[in-house]
Protein backbone atom coordinates (compact mmCIF):
# COMPACT_ATOMS: atom_id res chain seq x y z
CA UNK A 1 0.00 0.00 0.00
CA UNK A 2 1.54 3.28 -1.02
CA UNK A 3 -0.69 5.46 1.11
CA UNK A 4 0.88 3.98 4.26
CA UNK A 5 4.34 5.16 5.34
CA UNK A 6 6.47 3.73 8.15
CA UNK A 7 8.32 6.04 10.51
CA UNK A 8 10.66 3.22 11.60
CA UNK A 9 9.70 3.79 15.24
CA UNK A 10 7.09 2.45 17.62
CA UNK A 11 4.97 3.90 20.42
CA UNK A 12 4.92 7.37 18.84
CA UNK A 13 3.97 10.11 21.28
CA UNK A 14 1.55 12.83 20.21
CA UNK A 15 3.53 15.28 22.30
CA UNK A 16 5.84 17.35 20.08
CA UNK A 17 4.85 15.27 17.02
CA UNK A 18 5.33 17.22 13.78
CA UNK A 19 4.88 16.08 10.20
CA UNK A 20 5.12 18.11 7.04
CA UNK A 21 5.04 17.30 3.34
CA UNK A 22 7.56 19.09 1.16
CA UNK A 23 7.98 19.34 -2.60
CA UNK A 24 11.40 19.73 -4.23
CA UNK A 25 10.85 22.34 -6.95
CA UNK A 26 12.71 21.99 -10.26
CA UNK A 27 13.24 25.69 -10.87
CA UNK A 28 15.34 26.59 -7.85
CA UNK A 29 15.76 23.31 -5.96
CA UNK A 30 14.10 24.77 -2.87
CA UNK A 31 11.76 22.53 -0.89
CA UNK A 32 8.39 24.11 -0.21
CA UNK A 33 5.43 22.98 1.84
CA UNK A 34 2.93 24.21 -0.75
CA UNK A 35 2.33 24.39 -4.49
CA UNK A 36 3.31 27.61 -6.24
CA UNK A 37 0.61 27.50 -8.89
CA UNK A 38 -2.90 26.33 -9.72
CA UNK A 39 -6.01 26.22 -7.55
CA UNK A 40 -3.98 24.93 -4.59
CA UNK A 41 -1.38 27.71 -4.85
CA UNK A 42 -0.16 28.53 -1.34
CA UNK A 43 -2.21 25.81 0.38
CA UNK A 44 -0.03 23.72 2.74
CA UNK A 45 0.65 20.30 1.22
CA UNK A 46 -0.26 18.65 4.52
CA UNK A 47 -3.75 20.06 3.91
CA UNK A 48 -3.82 19.24 0.18
CA UNK A 49 -3.07 15.59 0.99
CA UNK A 50 -5.80 15.41 3.64
CA UNK A 51 -3.56 15.12 6.70
CA UNK A 52 -4.70 18.49 8.09
CA UNK A 53 -8.45 18.91 8.11
CA UNK A 54 -9.04 19.96 11.72
CA UNK A 55 -7.69 22.32 14.33
CA UNK A 56 -6.44 21.09 17.71
CA UNK A 57 -10.01 21.18 19.09
CA UNK A 58 -11.15 18.86 16.26
CA UNK A 59 -13.19 21.59 14.57
CA UNK A 60 -13.25 21.16 10.80
CA UNK A 61 -10.80 24.01 10.14
CA UNK A 62 -7.29 23.15 8.97
CA UNK A 63 -4.58 24.76 11.09
CA UNK A 64 -1.40 23.78 9.23
CA UNK A 65 -0.64 20.99 11.71
CA UNK A 66 -0.84 17.23 11.13
CA UNK A 67 -4.08 15.76 12.52
CA UNK A 68 -2.81 13.16 15.00
CA UNK A 69 -5.76 10.72 14.93
CA UNK A 70 -4.75 7.31 16.23
CA UNK A 71 -5.98 3.85 15.18
CA UNK A 72 -5.97 4.71 11.49
CA UNK A 73 -6.52 1.16 10.30
CA UNK A 74 -9.72 0.79 12.32
CA UNK A 75 -11.26 4.27 12.68
CA UNK A 76 -9.97 6.06 9.59
CA UNK A 77 -7.36 8.14 11.41
CA UNK A 78 -3.99 9.35 10.19
CA UNK A 79 -1.57 7.35 12.33
CA UNK A 80 -1.08 4.04 14.09
CA UNK A 81 1.06 5.34 16.95
CA UNK A 82 1.86 1.87 18.32
CA UNK A 83 3.19 0.72 14.94
CA UNK A 84 4.70 4.07 13.89
CA UNK A 85 2.78 4.26 10.62
CA UNK A 86 1.25 7.27 8.81
CA UNK A 87 -1.91 6.73 6.75
CA UNK A 88 -2.87 9.08 3.95
CA UNK A 89 -6.67 9.25 3.54
CA UNK A 90 -6.35 8.66 -0.22
CA UNK A 91 -5.42 5.35 -1.86
CA UNK A 92 -3.03 6.99 -4.36
CA UNK A 93 -2.11 10.31 -2.73
CA UNK A 94 0.70 11.14 -5.18
CA UNK A 95 -1.12 9.78 -8.24
CA UNK A 96 -4.76 9.75 -9.30
CA UNK A 97 -6.02 11.38 -6.09
CA UNK A 98 -3.65 14.35 -6.47
CA UNK A 99 -4.63 14.53 -10.14
CA UNK A 100 -8.28 14.97 -9.09
CA UNK A 101 -7.37 17.55 -6.44
CA UNK A 102 -5.36 19.71 -8.87
CA UNK A 103 -8.12 19.72 -11.52
CA UNK A 104 -5.62 20.71 -14.21
CA UNK A 105 -4.08 18.13 -16.55
CA UNK A 106 -0.92 20.14 -17.20
CA UNK A 107 -0.21 20.65 -13.49
CA UNK A 108 -1.16 17.05 -12.74
CA UNK A 109 1.35 15.81 -15.32
CA UNK A 110 3.98 17.99 -13.63
CA UNK A 111 3.31 16.98 -10.01
CA UNK A 112 1.71 13.52 -10.06
CA UNK A 113 3.72 10.31 -9.88
CA UNK A 114 1.07 7.94 -11.26
CA UNK A 115 3.45 5.06 -11.96
CA UNK A 116 4.52 5.03 -8.29
CA UNK A 117 1.59 2.70 -7.69
CA UNK A 118 2.72 0.11 -10.22
CA UNK A 119 6.49 0.16 -9.60
CA UNK A 120 8.69 -1.33 -6.90
CA UNK A 121 10.53 1.08 -4.59
CA UNK A 122 13.82 0.65 -6.47
CA UNK A 123 12.08 1.20 -9.82
CA UNK A 124 10.30 4.33 -8.54
CA UNK A 125 13.62 5.79 -7.39
CA UNK A 126 14.76 5.74 -11.03
CA UNK A 127 12.40 8.67 -11.78
CA UNK A 128 13.98 11.66 -10.01
CA UNK A 129 11.85 14.05 -12.07
CA UNK A 130 8.74 12.59 -10.38
CA UNK A 131 10.14 11.50 -7.02
CA UNK A 132 10.00 14.97 -5.43
CA UNK A 133 7.73 14.73 -2.41
CA UNK A 134 9.26 14.32 1.04
CA UNK A 135 7.86 13.64 4.49
CA UNK A 136 9.68 15.65 7.13
CA UNK A 137 9.06 15.84 10.82
CA UNK A 138 9.98 14.91 14.33
CA UNK A 139 8.57 12.60 16.95
CA UNK A 140 9.21 11.04 20.30
CA UNK A 141 9.09 7.29 20.52
CA UNK A 142 9.23 4.93 23.42
CA UNK A 143 9.15 1.23 23.79
CA UNK A 144 9.28 -0.87 26.89
CA UNK A 145 12.42 -2.50 28.14
CA UNK A 146 10.49 -5.63 29.03
CA UNK A 147 9.32 -8.48 26.85
CA UNK A 148 6.16 -10.28 27.91
CA UNK A 149 6.54 -14.06 27.91
CA UNK A 150 2.78 -14.55 28.41
CA UNK A 151 3.40 -17.15 31.10
CA UNK A 152 3.32 -17.38 34.89
CA UNK A 153 5.63 -18.93 37.49
CA UNK A 154 8.66 -19.12 35.21
CA UNK A 155 11.60 -20.58 37.21
CA UNK A 156 14.63 -18.33 37.66
CA UNK A 157 17.30 -19.11 35.06
CA UNK A 158 14.99 -21.07 32.75
CA UNK A 159 14.78 -18.32 30.12
CA UNK A 160 17.55 -17.94 27.55
CA UNK A 161 18.00 -14.51 26.02
CA UNK A 162 20.08 -14.29 22.86
CA UNK A 163 21.40 -11.42 20.77
CA UNK A 164 23.08 -12.12 17.46
CA UNK A 165 23.22 -15.83 18.26
CA UNK A 166 25.07 -15.26 21.55
CA UNK A 167 23.44 -16.25 24.85
CA UNK A 168 23.27 -13.26 27.22
CA UNK A 169 23.85 -13.57 30.95
CA UNK A 170 21.03 -12.50 33.28
CA UNK A 171 22.10 -9.70 35.62
CA UNK A 172 25.15 -8.93 33.46
CA UNK A 173 24.01 -8.41 29.87
CA UNK A 174 20.39 -7.65 30.65
Where would I find each of the regions flagged by the language model?
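Surface-exposed, low-hydrophobicity segments enriched in Gly/Pro/acidic/Ser residues
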Residues: 1-174
Amino acid sequence: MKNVYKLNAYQISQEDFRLNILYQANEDGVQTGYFREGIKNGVPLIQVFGLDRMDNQQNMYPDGVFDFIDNASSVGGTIEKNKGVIYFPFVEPFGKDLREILQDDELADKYCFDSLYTLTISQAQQYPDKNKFYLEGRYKSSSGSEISLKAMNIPQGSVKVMAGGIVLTEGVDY
